[in-house]
């Protein structure tokens, strides 16, 4: 991979998740994430779905799993005819979607544990390089019957970091 895009998620509690994104593997997905981050779309949004031992999901402006940015992007994964060799291991960031392969918009998830059964079905586009303990803290909060944290897990900002 020649190109790497660096990003940071700053949490309300001061926790920082550093990511590297791979535009050579998932160019549409990375471009979309960068566009949303640069427009401050994610600022103030929550991780609305948290399942310890699986993943933490955020990026919905509605905070319940139904919202997006007003557009959808092509799903960059094998079942949709796109080669993507990023495996859904602990710390990998990927796009959430509905049953429609091309329905991803702004919602993303970070794998709390290896979830390789998702490989080829979801557009992985990067990984956590620092702050996996912050992912662990989010994954370990108490949740309701919809897997929504009882205490909000709010992102203050998502920023693209120039190298």
Where are these regions (language model features)?
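Cyclophilin-like peptidyl-prolyl cis-trans isomerases
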Residues: 1-163
